[in-house]
Amino acid sequence: RIDGKLIANRLEPGKRPRSSMAPTIVLKDGRPIIIIGSPGGSNIISFVVNSIIALLEWDMNIQEAVSHPHAINKWGKFEIEESLYSSNLENSLKAMGYDTKIRKYYSGLNGIYIDTEIYGGSDPRREGIALGN
């Protein structure tokens, strides 16, 4: 409480956040190298983390990373974005015991990658813009 008023979304043990917002800044040697965020309700965290992995582990540039199709595991069911769908992927997931669901996603990621220059990337699934040098 502040001045006797309850604080919405205050951090407390056992509470769940009222939002999945995940605006993220990734640092390297104390300096920002990635700034990224997305709308998308309960999918936001997966959208952001998948894009960071695409940048850092799969050597995609920022535009490729925010445009990449999604496959998200929710409570044991893999939701596969239509543009990523293949029967091989679906059959492989089912062979591992996962249920699957094919769907559209409207992530709307926007991000900036900073190296020797600044690069912007904006998800083509929604309107947006992120500019670099």
Where are the predicted features?
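Extended C-terminal subregions enriched in glycine
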Residues: 14-17, 57-105
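Short, solvent-exposed loop/turn segments at the edges of secondary structure
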Residues: 6, 18-21, 47, 73, ...
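Cofactor-centric catalytic regions
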Residues: 85-133
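Active-site rim segments in enzyme catalytic domains, especially the processed small/beta chain
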Residues: 1-34, 58
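Second-shell loop/turn segments in exported
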Residues: 35-39, 77-80
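Flexible loop/turn segments at secondary-structure boundaries
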Residues: 33-34, 42-45, 74, 85-88, ...
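Hydrophobic, well-ordered secondary-structure elements that form the walls
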Residues: 25, 48, 65, 112
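Alpha-helical support elements that line or immediately flank enzyme active sites
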Residues: 39-60
